[in-house]
């Protein structure tokens, strides 16, 4: 059975579960193509639709998972799905729409949550939370996943310890809005106990590398910065920022303003840890949101350089014209497509300049690399701070090796 993942780590988690389920139930025939889909932008949708069509033309049966196949965590009504993606309708008999989880009671987040099929993987995804109540005005994902649920601490700890017992060296803490862990509603940032969870992971596990997936800034307190000063947390932090302009953040309904971004990014850059100069900051940014002026856009560009954001997930605003409307698509003053493309190009260019300077500052340093791919006499992997490295000889897959970085082996 062939499979492909689009976009996020939560999709990766559930894709692993789905693969294990299909294998257990003997539904993993060679003529099946399993795809985990994403709806973050119209461009993302078009990519997986093209991939599906390619496999349908090969006479494959296609199992569709992820946000593209769901409504509130359940499999989408087929008539609605084919109304959104009419190009797939001629192949209706070969398409199966899947719910979020193959075996989970939607009212009980802990039921069947442990990810099967990862025993041979050294990097494991640990989901701690699902769903979001924030209703950002650009977001379609909120209508796709199931209800906001928090995974119990004892289950999280048990799974991390199991990962290490099976040879794992790194876990990735993930979720849809993971920093809201333990809040009754993700809009109640004061109820979050995310930093407490991270502290307990340090106390109750010994796995050497802990990576935190994308987090929203409004949940982060001084206690969070104290906890992640521990070097077991890799020096790589990914923030869902979207904009640095206050009027745009308000229009997006993000729940924070630029002063909170300044606080969070400044404290991350000043963490009291021995590898402070190696801290990598990644960010999700949307350019050309409705009402965004050139001044608003420039504020964001300047901030990328000011805070040394080393990797951008930059997207032009998508109004989701494929019938699934979001609140922001109804706002006046939509930015013309040519301006959207140009602003995003400029933003990516600035991000690449910052990234290049950051990577070059590591030349000559010895870094630990987790080997993720071994092929044709070469090994590929990532450093603790997520610099991608290619080494011209083969190491054991999922081993951690010391590598002196230079302009030849850093492939970003």
Regions found by a protein language model. Give the residues of each.
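N-terminal pre-triad scaffold of radical SAM enzymes
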Residues: 1-12, 109-138, 142, 157, ...
């Amino acid at each position: 059975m062939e499979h492909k993942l689009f976009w996020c780590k939560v999709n990766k988690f559930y894709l692993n579960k789905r693969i294990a389920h299909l294998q257990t139930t003997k539904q993993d025939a060679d003529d099946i193509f399993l795809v985990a889909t994403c709806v973050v932008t119209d461009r993302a949708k078009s990519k997986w639709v093209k991939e599906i069509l390619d496999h349908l033309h090969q006479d494959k049966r296609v199992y569709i998972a992820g946000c593209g196949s769901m409504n509130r965590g359940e499999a989408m009504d087929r008539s609605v799905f084919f109304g959104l993606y009419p190009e797939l309708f001629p192949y209706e008999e070969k398409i199966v729409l899947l719910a979020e989880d193959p075996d989970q009671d939607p009212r009980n987040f802990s039921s069947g949550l442990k990810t099967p099929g990862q025993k041979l993987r050294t990097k494991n995804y640990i989901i701690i939370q699902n769903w979001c109540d924030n209703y950002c005005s650009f977001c379609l994902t909120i209508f796709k996943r199931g209800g906001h649920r928090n995974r119990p601490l004892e289950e999280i700890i048990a799974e991390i310890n199991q990962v290490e017992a099976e040879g794992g060296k790194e876990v990735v803490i993930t979720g849809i809005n993971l920093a809201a862990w333990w809040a009754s509603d993700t809009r109640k940032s004061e109820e979050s106990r995310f930093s407490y969870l991270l502290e307990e992971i340090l106390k109750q596990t010994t796995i050497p590398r802990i990576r935190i997936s994308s987090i929203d800034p409004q949940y982060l307190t001084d206690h969070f910065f104290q906890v992640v000063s521990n070097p077991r947390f890799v020096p790589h932090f990914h923030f869902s920022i979207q904009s640095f302009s206050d009027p745009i953040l308000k229009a997006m309904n993000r729940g924070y303003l630029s002063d909170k971004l300044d606080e969070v990014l400044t404290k991350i850059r000043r963490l009291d840890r021995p590898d402070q100069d190696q801290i990598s900051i990644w960010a999700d940014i949307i350019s050309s949101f409705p009402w965004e002026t050139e001044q608003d856009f420039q504020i964001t560009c300047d901030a990328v350089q000011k805070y040394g954001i080393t990797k951008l997930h930059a997207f032009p605003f998508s109004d989701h014209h494929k019938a699934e409307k979001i609140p922001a698509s109804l706002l006046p003053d939509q930015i013309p497509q040519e301006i959207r493309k140009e602003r995003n190009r400029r933003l990516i260019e600035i991000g690449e300049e910052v990234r290049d300077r950051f990577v070059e500052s590591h030349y000559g340093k010895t870094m630990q690399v987790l080997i993720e791919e071994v092929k044709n006499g070469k090994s590929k992997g990532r450093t603790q701070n997520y610099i991608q490295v290619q080494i011209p000889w083969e190491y054991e897959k999922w081993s951690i090796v010391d590598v002196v970085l230079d302009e030849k082996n850093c492939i970003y």
